[in-house]
Amino acid sequence: MSHLQSFPAFSLNFTFYLYKIYIISSEFCICNSESDQPTKDKIMKQKLSVFSLLILSFVLLFSCFGFRRIASDTPEAREVYSRAAYDTYAEDIFASRESFPGLIVSIQADNDTLYGEENGLLSARYMCSGREGECEIQVFVYDQSGTPLIAQNAGLRISGATSRNAIRKSFRVIARKEYDKQHPKFTYDLWNGRTTLDGATKPIQEYSSFILHSVRLAMDSTGIHNSVGYSLARKAGIVDASPTTPAAVYINGKYQGAYFLMPAKTDNALAELYNIEKKEDIEVVSVFEEEKTGTQSRPEILASYLTFVDFLQNADMTDPSVIKQVEAQLDVHQCLQYYAVNLLLGNGDWLDNNLRVWRCKDNGLPYQDGKWRFFLFDLDWIGSFSDLVVMNFEQATQSANYHNILPALLKNPEYKKEFTDLIYQMEEDAFTPEVIDSVFAKEEEQMHDEVAYDFQSEAFTGYLMYSVNSSPLEEKDYITMEDRQILIEDFRNHLVNTPALINNCIENGF
């Protein structure tokens, strides 16, 4: 990375070598004393001289590393500690605030690479996808005390579809061997204990990328929409619902706002989560990618999925041989779960927009069976108004538009019963007022202070302005923490009221 400093190849094992130098030097001085029998005073003076050099070395060392703590006494943690010295903005970042409520992410890159008029990632290439929309960075992640958790070279992309136009953008941070030969993966668990979902429950100790999801209007207007949604989904039985971690994000030392970190939803991420050996065995496609961005990056996978959709929508769902074919190509239970939880979350940006599916080659292992499965993602617009909740239910259960397969599945009486049973069970497990209130309390406790800081920062205009083409802000556009509290109360009330609306739809027949 020619425009960034290179990380050193050594770690804090250097302190051990300083100590060894002290011992060896002391012995050397004693053995080479002018007298065959050196006096105690001479020996002490020689040792003190060497000891002074040792102390000076330590002072120089720790002046570089800013007296930060080491995350744990392991070679990996010591190396991260030593690399964190190369975050030239860290001192100013930590001096700018009395405390941090969550993680701190510091990104360094050449300013022209990010903001150049012709080729800047954030100024000119924010609609580019793939490697064309990626630039080299150095990324540092710290905990609240300033302990470095991640320090390495990586790639940066804009995350999202139409939201790429927003002033405040979301990012995907990607580890690659070409950027950092010593660290081709991230190795610190930012989500406190993720494990594989294949039944082995192995700790996920390495991963290829993570998302920095921005908090802004008019998307995740409260700052907790996504975290509340994913937390409720996990309680409802959606095992792959993303964990979220609040963070303050800085680029070249400048505060960008309140964000939260979450695992990526890519073929690499699926391989890590489901313990799939070869990511090449995985097929992932965003069904409406072309409608949202103008291009479809995986047309052959989309064609395969739409062939299955066409088969399903025209199948006789009472024929046992047809059911066998369906179940060989679709994880029906997971599909019904996916629809049920989206309806209970009141997701208003889903059926005709955020639809992503995946499957893995049949390797005879859990989740490696050739069956299509659905992603739960992008929960910015959950907690919809009553009318939209009812409309969503009717569209999801009755209309085949937008490649919707639920109506076809519900033609099978057993699937229909399973679907309604899932809704009732989810309501009991996750969507009672008590559970909803506990989730809100937890997520707000984690995010409140960072959002409060954000609202007082220069980055706040990025929170308010959705598009780079937005009109200049006026006084009426600004919101306060009191306004945000009203939004949170509305959000909470919509979620609490949704189960009764869904139950009424079920009772009226569908």
Language-model-detected regions and their locations in the chain:
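Short, Lys/Arg-enriched N-terminal segments with co-localized hydrophobic residues
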Residues: 18-43
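N-terminal Sec-pathway targeting helices
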Residues: 43-55
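Sec-dependent signal peptide cleavage junction
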Residues: 64-73
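Middle-to-C-terminal accessory/interaction subdomains
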Residues: 80-85, 89-95, 100-129, 137-138, ...
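Conserved ATP-binding subdomain of kinase catalytic cores across diverse folds
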Residues: 133-292
